Amino acid sequence: MLLVAFVTLLVAVALQPLPSVLSLDVHLLRQLAAKHNVTSILVFGDSSVDPGNNNFIKTEMKGNFPPYGENFINHKPTGRLCDGLLAPDYIAEAMGYPPIPAFLDPSLTQADLTRGASFASAGSGYDDLTANISNVWSFTTQANYFLHYKIHLTKLVGPLESAKMINNAIFLMSMGSNDFLQNYLVDFTRQKQFTVEQYIEFLSHRMLYDAKMLHRLGAKRLVVVGVPPMGCMPLIKYLRGQKTCVDQLNQIAFSFNAKIIKNLELLQSKIGLKTIYVDAYSTIQEAIKNPRKFGFVEASLGCCGTGTYEYGETCKDMQVCKDPTKYVFWDAVHPTQRMYQIIVKKAIASISEEFLV
């Protein structure tokens, strides 16, 4: 359900041309990726990066129906909880590849496998209990499916080439919002165990553990997207009965992101894992405070339905705004692809500077 966090899209068919400055960033990234044999992107997380795995899971956390996907290739709803592409698709396009597929997609080809896959599941989080609440894949389950991916890839290209491809891949993690919005703040299990501060620390340890697990499985480059300003989601403001952002939730997100940043510094210094932090929080917050700076006209409501509470099933077959590119939020929880595009521009620059030098 509730989820947001970080990035999306690029030079896709049926999408408007990108700004020239971004095209320059893309050109550099493509050159460097080829130089360093970065041929795949491997994705873990929640709805911010799930291209449709949940279509094949018995859960209500889906987006494989209109109006989702109305700006995707051929206007097709794929399971992405957005009007178009997600961040991993965007980064893949920047590297010259098609959108990143869901690992469970039955149409997955051998060529797709060599370019990576997403194991993400909408509704998931760092806390395995979060996934259990919505009956979706926990990070642990996602990692297990990644092991299946490695087996398939090894059969396809051989053990040496498979190991090389995984070592050269860009790993991406994007989750955390659901741990608070779907779990701690609405379910009493964790509240009985932890204060908010203690739960943030608990999630920080889980995030660190997950990153180390990916490193053991072959990750050398890891991108982690921070939690967005949860208190600014239209749904949260609607439920709290206020028009302005809920400061308490934004402070929780800010505090957790600070822990993520420290963890990434630790991973880099202790085990040599190259890391990049994508600051979705600051970018989205800036767009909400100064929408016209980014070409937006609506930063408080979602594009779907009334824009106050609709997301997932409640957004199904609803009327949408005429121009999603003018909106920060697509539904009452998830950003538009235009908002993701703005975030990813920074990510592409960081990937070029930090990973591929």
Swiss-Prot record:
| Enzyme category, top tier | hydrolase
Stored CDD domains = SGNH_plant_lipase_like (cd01837)
Query: Can you say where in the cell this protein is located?
Result: Secreted
Q: Where is the active site?
A: S47 (nucleophile), D331, H334
**Gene Ontology molecular function:** hydrolase activity, acting on ester bonds
**Cited InterPro entries:** GDSL, GDSL_lipolytic_enzyme, SGNH_hydro_sf, SGNH_plant_lipase-like
The lineage's top-level taxon is: Eukaryota
Sugar attachment sites: N37, N132
| Example GO BP | lipid catabolic process
Predominant location: secreted
* Gene3D superfamilies the UniProt entry points to: SGNH hydrolase
According to its UniProt record, the EC number is: 3.1.1.-
Transmembrane ranges, per UniProt, are none
Q: Name one GO cellular component term.
A: extracellular region
Annotated signal sequence is: 1-23
Its family remark reads:
Belongs to the 'GDSL' lipolytic enzyme family.
Protein name (Swiss-Prot/TrEMBL): GDSL esterase/lipase At5g45950
**Which source organism?**
Arabidopsis thaliana (Mouse-ear cress)
